[in-house]
C-alpha cells in the first residue's frame, strides 16, 4: 500500500486555476475509495438543482457563495449564503443549486456514488413547479453533467413551464 502525502493547496490552486471553468467550475482535487474532494471556483450562474443520493459538505475557502436549497417535499426554495470560512453539511437528496461569485473558491466533499442515480432539476421561477428533471449516473462531471446543463439551456421547450407557460432563464441572477 502506498501511503498518501500532503498537498500544498494554495500551490495546487495557483497551478490549476484554469481547470475551474464554467458552467460547473469544478475539479476533483483528491479522491479516495469512499470520498472525493472537489475544488469549485466562480463565477457560475446555475439555475439547475442537483439531487445527490449522499450528503455533501461545503467549505468556503475564499469569498462567499449562495447555496439555493429546495425542500424535498414542498419545493420551497431557501437561499443560504456561505461566507468565507463557513461550512455546511447538506443532507442527502436535498435539491441544491450552488451559485458562486467571481474570484471565489470552495471545497466540496462527497461520498462516491458507485452507479447510484442522481438528478438535475429545474424549477419554474414564476410558479415554483418542476420544469425539467433528468436522472443519470455521473461518472465524470465534464462528460455527464455539462451536456445535461447545455441541453436545458439550448431548449426553450425544456425551459418552458408546463403549468404556467413561463420561459425560464438560462442563468440565475441574484
Model-predicted segments: where are they?
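Jelly-roll (double-stranded beta-helix
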Residues: 1-59, 64-87, 95-174
Amino acid at each position: 500500500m502506498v501511503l498518501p502525502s500532503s498537498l500544498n493547496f494554495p500551490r495546487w490552486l495557483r497551478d490549476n486555476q484554469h481547470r475551474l471553468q464554467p458552467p460547473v467550475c469544478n475539479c476533483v482535487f483528491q479522491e479516495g475509495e469512499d470520498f472525493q474532494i472537489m475544488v469549485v471556483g466562480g463565477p457560475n450562474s446555475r439555475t439547475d438543482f442537483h439531487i445527490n443520493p449522499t450528503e455533501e459538505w461545503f467549505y468556503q475557502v475564499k469569498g462567499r457563495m449562495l447555496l439555493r436549497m429546495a425542500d424535498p417535499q414542498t419545493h420551497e426554495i431557501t437561499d443560504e449564503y456561505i461566507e468565507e470560512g463557513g461550512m455546511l453539511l447538506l443532507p442527502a437528496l436535498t435539491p441544491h443549486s450552488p451559485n458562486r461569485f467571481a474570484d471565489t473558491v470552495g471545497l466540496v466533499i462527497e461520498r462516491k456514488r458507485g452507479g447510484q442515480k442522481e438528478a438535475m432539476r429545474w424549477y419554474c421561477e414564476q410558479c415554483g413547479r418542476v420544469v425539467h428533471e433528468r436522472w443519470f449516473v455521473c461518472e465524470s462531471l465534464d462528460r455527464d453533467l455539462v451536456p445535461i446543463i447545455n441541453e436545458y439551456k439550448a431548449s426553450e421547450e425544456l425551459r418552458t413551464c408546463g403549468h404556467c407557460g413561463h420561459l425560464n432563464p438560462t442563468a440565475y441572477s441574484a
